[in-house]
Amino acid sequence: MNGETPAQKAARLAAAAALAAKTAADAAAKAAAKAAAIAAAAASA
């Protein structure tokens, strides 16, 4: 359709998957940090 070879398509899909995984990992890290901060505040209260 757009002249993309199967290898190019696979590489593009792999890059998109890697970006999605990084985004999910960043979100999980932020959530964990927030939960830890809340737990620390609750423990000190």
Curated annotation (Swiss-Prot):
Sequence repeats lie at residues 9-21, 22-33, 34-45. Keywords: Antifreeze protein, Repeat. The keyword Repeat applies. The keyword Repeat applies. The modification Blocked amino end (Met) is found at residue 1. Belongs to the type-I AFP family. Antifreeze proteins lower the blood freezing point. This is Ice-structuring protein SS-8. It comes from Myoxocephalus scorpius.
